[in-house]
Amino acid sequence: KGFELSFAYHPIKSLQFSMNYGYTHARYLEYKKSATEDFSGNRLPMVPNHTLSMDGTYTVLQAGWFDKIVVNAGLTGLGRIYWADDNVVRQNFYATLNAKVSLTKGIFTWDLWGKNLTGTDYIAYSFKMSTGNYAQKGKPLTFGTSLSMTF
């Protein structure tokens, strides 16, 4: 069970906003792994209850020396996520903020970007072994640049 909502708004040609939200209520109807392990009613592992993305983009054409400047910021959120059938280990809802500035001149585009600008600490993946639970942390605050050529 679940639903999704999408929204897009363009107040002026150069400015765009979008928002997407999804809710999932995914549970095992019946799942008895053994006589002592009954996961019936538990949430499915690795299926987030909520997904969220919000995005804003502003584009300037013929901006001085550049043919185009694009400024973008976006928020992405996930959670609660259970990592195994027993629903013991979980990641609560978290959100990361990302941004990018793109400068285009002719066939070249130079991007300057930042990811997880809020430095959100989260678990990207977790798994269970006989020796315990193991987790991979999400990516920290990251900055970067790229140069691309379109022809």
Question: What name fits each language-model region?
Answer:
Residues 7, 98-103:
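Alpha-helix C-terminal capping segments
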Residues 1, 48-52, 93-97, 106, ...:
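Residues that define the transmembrane beta-barrel architecture of outer-membrane proteins
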Residues 25, 41-44, 91-93, 114, ...:
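Generic secondary-structure boundary/loop-capping signal
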Residues 35-36, 72, 89, 117, ...:
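Sparse recognition of residues in long alpha-helices and their boundaries
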Residues 76-84, 102-151:
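C-terminal beta-signal and adjacent terminal beta-strands/loops
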Residues 1-85, 146-148:
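Gram-negative outer-membrane beta-barrel transporters
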Residues 84-91, 97-100:
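Short, glycine/charged-rich beta-strand-loop motifs at protein surfaces that mediate ligand recognition
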